[in-house]
Protein backbone atom coordinates (compact mmCIF):
# COMPACT_ATOMS: atom_id res chain seq x y z
CA UNK A 1 0.00 0.00 0.00
CA UNK A 2 1.17 3.53 -0.77
CA UNK A 3 0.19 5.94 2.01
CA UNK A 4 0.26 9.65 1.25
CA UNK A 5 0.25 12.43 3.81
CA UNK A 6 -1.24 15.81 2.99
CA UNK A 7 -1.02 18.12 5.99
CA UNK A 8 -2.49 21.15 4.26
CA UNK A 9 -5.08 20.06 1.66
CA UNK A 10 -7.02 22.69 -0.22
CA UNK A 11 -9.91 23.51 -2.45
CA UNK A 12 -8.34 25.05 -5.54
CA UNK A 13 -10.62 27.61 -7.19
CA UNK A 14 -9.37 28.11 -10.73
CA UNK A 15 -10.70 30.96 -12.87
CA UNK A 16 -9.90 32.23 -16.35
CA UNK A 17 -10.26 35.97 -16.99
CA UNK A 18 -9.61 37.75 -20.28
CA UNK A 19 -7.30 40.78 -19.91
CA UNK A 20 -7.38 40.90 -16.11
CA UNK A 21 -7.26 44.48 -14.80
CA UNK A 22 -6.15 45.16 -11.25
CA UNK A 23 -8.53 47.44 -9.34
CA UNK A 24 -11.46 46.81 -11.69
CA UNK A 25 -14.38 44.38 -11.78
CA UNK A 26 -13.39 41.38 -13.92
CA UNK A 27 -15.73 38.67 -15.22
CA UNK A 28 -14.65 35.05 -15.35
CA UNK A 29 -14.70 33.09 -18.61
CA UNK A 30 -14.35 29.69 -16.95
CA UNK A 31 -14.38 28.46 -13.35
CA UNK A 32 -13.63 25.15 -11.70
CA UNK A 33 -13.09 23.81 -8.20
CA UNK A 34 -10.70 20.93 -7.49
CA UNK A 35 -9.20 19.29 -4.44
CA UNK A 36 -5.53 20.23 -4.08
CA UNK A 37 -2.49 19.02 -2.18
CA UNK A 38 0.56 17.15 -3.44
CA UNK A 39 -0.11 14.00 -1.43
CA UNK A 40 -3.71 13.91 -2.60
CA UNK A 41 -2.57 14.34 -6.20
CA UNK A 42 -0.24 11.36 -5.82
CA UNK A 43 -3.07 9.19 -4.50
CA UNK A 44 -5.39 10.28 -7.33
CA UNK A 45 -2.82 9.23 -9.95
CA UNK A 46 -2.10 5.94 -8.15
CA UNK A 47 -5.84 5.21 -8.01
CA UNK A 48 -6.10 5.69 -11.79
CA UNK A 49 -3.14 3.34 -12.24
CA UNK A 50 -4.79 0.67 -10.11
CA UNK A 51 -2.19 0.88 -7.33
CA UNK A 52 -3.54 0.55 -3.74
CA UNK A 53 -3.28 3.88 -1.95
CA UNK A 54 -4.61 5.64 1.11
CA UNK A 55 -4.68 9.33 1.96
CA UNK A 56 -3.86 10.50 5.48
CA UNK A 57 -4.36 14.14 6.31
CA UNK A 58 -5.96 16.94 8.27
CA UNK A 59 -9.21 18.74 7.45
CA UNK A 60 -11.15 21.54 9.11
CA UNK A 61 -14.45 23.34 8.75
CA UNK A 62 -16.81 23.46 5.77
CA UNK A 63 -13.97 23.39 3.23
CA UNK A 64 -12.57 20.31 4.94
CA UNK A 65 -15.92 18.56 4.65
CA UNK A 66 -16.02 19.39 0.94
CA UNK A 67 -12.50 17.97 0.47
CA UNK A 68 -13.53 14.75 2.21
CA UNK A 69 -16.70 14.52 0.09
CA UNK A 70 -14.86 14.98 -3.20
CA UNK A 71 -12.22 12.39 -2.33
CA UNK A 72 -14.93 9.92 -1.32
CA UNK A 73 -16.68 10.51 -4.66
CA UNK A 74 -13.46 9.42 -6.39
CA UNK A 75 -13.53 6.21 -4.32
CA UNK A 76 -10.09 6.83 -2.85
CA UNK A 77 -9.49 5.40 0.61
CA UNK A 78 -8.75 8.12 3.16
CA UNK A 79 -8.45 8.71 6.89
CA UNK A 80 -8.86 12.29 7.98
CA UNK A 81 -8.03 13.91 11.29
CA UNK A 82 -10.65 16.62 11.76
CA UNK A 83 -9.32 19.76 13.40
CA UNK A 84 -11.61 21.48 15.93
CA UNK A 85 -10.93 25.01 14.69
CA UNK A 86 -10.42 26.87 11.43
CA UNK A 87 -11.08 25.84 7.85
CA UNK A 88 -9.05 23.94 5.30
CA UNK A 89 -7.57 26.48 2.91
CA UNK A 90 -8.87 27.76 -0.40
CA UNK A 91 -6.29 28.54 -3.08
CA UNK A 92 -7.15 30.86 -5.95
CA UNK A 93 -5.60 30.14 -9.36
CA UNK A 94 -6.08 33.05 -11.75
CA UNK A 95 -5.28 32.49 -15.42
CA UNK A 96 -5.23 35.61 -17.58
CA UNK A 97 -2.36 37.22 -19.47
CA UNK A 98 -0.14 35.63 -16.83
CA UNK A 99 -0.84 32.96 -14.23
CA UNK A 100 -1.27 34.13 -10.63
CA UNK A 101 -1.80 32.03 -7.52
CA UNK A 102 -2.99 33.11 -4.08
CA UNK A 103 -2.54 30.28 -1.59
CA UNK A 104 -4.17 30.16 1.83
CA UNK A 105 -2.25 29.35 5.03
CA UNK A 106 -4.43 26.56 6.37
CA UNK A 107 -5.45 25.79 9.97
CA UNK A 108 -3.04 25.25 12.86
CA UNK A 109 -2.32 21.68 13.94
CA UNK A 110 -1.60 20.81 17.59
CA UNK A 111 0.78 18.23 19.06
CA UNK A 112 -2.23 16.11 19.99
CA UNK A 113 -3.36 15.96 16.37
CA UNK A 114 0.16 15.15 15.19
CA UNK A 115 0.14 12.29 17.69
CA UNK A 116 -3.10 11.01 16.14
CA UNK A 117 -1.38 10.95 12.75
CA UNK A 118 1.60 9.07 14.18
CA UNK A 119 -0.77 6.48 15.66
CA UNK A 120 -2.30 5.93 12.22
CA UNK A 121 1.18 5.30 10.84
CA UNK A 122 1.60 2.51 13.38
CA UNK A 123 0.05 -0.02 10.98
CA UNK A 124 2.65 0.55 8.23
CA UNK A 125 5.10 -2.26 7.50
CA UNK A 126 8.27 -2.51 5.43
CA UNK A 127 6.08 -3.60 2.51
CA UNK A 128 4.42 -0.17 2.45
CA UNK A 129 5.55 3.14 0.96
CA UNK A 130 4.99 6.49 2.66
CA UNK A 131 4.80 9.70 0.60
CA UNK A 132 5.37 12.99 2.42
CA UNK A 133 4.35 15.70 -0.01
CA UNK A 134 3.65 19.41 -0.13
CA UNK A 135 4.00 22.26 2.30
CA UNK A 136 3.02 22.16 5.96
CA UNK A 137 1.43 24.71 8.26
CA UNK A 138 3.66 27.06 10.24
CA UNK A 139 2.47 25.37 13.43
CA UNK A 140 4.20 22.13 12.34
CA UNK A 141 7.57 23.70 11.57
CA UNK A 142 10.15 22.96 8.88
CA UNK A 143 11.43 19.78 10.56
CA UNK A 144 8.03 18.05 10.52
CA UNK A 145 8.89 15.55 7.78
CA UNK A 146 12.32 14.93 9.29
CA UNK A 147 10.73 14.27 12.68
CA UNK A 148 8.36 11.75 11.07
CA UNK A 149 11.23 9.98 9.32
CA UNK A 150 13.28 9.88 12.51
CA UNK A 151 10.46 8.01 14.26
CA UNK A 152 10.08 5.58 11.35
CA UNK A 153 13.77 4.95 10.62
CA UNK A 154 13.98 1.57 12.40
CA UNK A 155 10.89 0.19 10.64
CA UNK A 156 12.40 -0.03 7.13
CA UNK A 157 9.51 1.86 5.53
CA UNK A 158 10.42 3.35 2.16
CA UNK A 159 9.72 7.06 2.25
CA UNK A 160 9.29 9.43 -0.68
CA UNK A 161 9.55 13.17 -0.06
CA UNK A 162 8.23 15.89 -2.37
CA UNK A 163 8.99 19.17 -0.62
CA UNK A 164 11.17 22.24 -0.92
CA UNK A 165 13.51 24.46 1.09
CA UNK A 166 14.27 23.60 4.70
CA UNK A 167 11.47 21.03 4.75
CA UNK A 168 13.35 19.02 2.12
CA UNK A 169 16.83 19.77 3.43
CA UNK A 170 15.97 18.53 6.92
CA UNK A 171 15.03 15.01 5.72
CA UNK A 172 18.28 14.31 3.85
CA UNK A 173 20.19 12.95 6.90
CA UNK A 174 17.47 10.26 7.20
CA UNK A 175 18.07 9.01 3.64
CA UNK A 176 14.61 8.98 2.06
CA UNK A 177 14.07 6.32 -0.60
CA UNK A 178 13.32 9.05 -3.15
CA UNK A 179 13.08 12.83 -3.34
CA UNK A 180 11.40 14.73 -6.17
CA UNK A 181 12.66 18.29 -6.32
CA UNK A 182 11.87 20.39 -9.39
CA UNK A 183 14.38 22.83 -10.88
CA UNK A 184 13.44 25.72 -8.59
CA UNK A 185 13.65 23.47 -5.52
CA UNK A 186 17.07 22.14 -6.58
CA UNK A 187 18.33 25.68 -7.14
CA UNK A 188 17.15 26.62 -3.67
CA UNK A 189 18.65 23.51 -2.09
CA UNK A 190 22.11 23.97 -3.60
CA UNK A 191 22.05 27.76 -3.95
CA UNK A 192 22.80 27.66 -7.68
CA UNK A 193 20.89 29.21 -10.59
CA UNK A 194 22.97 28.48 -13.69
CA UNK A 195 25.77 26.29 -15.06
CA UNK A 196 28.41 28.80 -14.04
CA UNK A 197 27.31 28.53 -10.41
CA UNK A 198 27.51 24.73 -10.60
CA UNK A 199 31.06 24.80 -11.98
Name the predicted role of every residue range.
Residues 129-195:
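Conserved beta-alpha-beta core of the PfkB/ribokinase-like small-molecule kinase fold
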Residues 1-23:
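Positively charged, low-complexity intrinsically disordered leader regions
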Residues 27-87:
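Substrate-binding N-lobe of the ribokinase-like
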Residues 19-27, 180-183:
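Short glycine/proline- and charge-enriched loop/turn segments
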Residues 83, 93-126:
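Conserved phosphate-binding/catalytic loop of the ribokinase/pfkB sugar-kinase fold
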Residues 198-199:
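Conserved small/polar residues in nucleotide/adenosyl-binding loops
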Residues 4-7, 57-58, 93-95, 103-105, ...:
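Short beta-strand segments
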Residues 9-11, 59-60, 85, 185:
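Glycine-rich beta-alpha junction loops
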Amino acid sequence: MVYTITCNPSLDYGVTVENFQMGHTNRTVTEQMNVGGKGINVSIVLKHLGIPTKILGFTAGFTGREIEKRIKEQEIEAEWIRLPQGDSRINVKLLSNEGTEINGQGPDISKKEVQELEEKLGILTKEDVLVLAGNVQKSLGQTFYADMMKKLKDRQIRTVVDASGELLKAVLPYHPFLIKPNQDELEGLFQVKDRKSVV
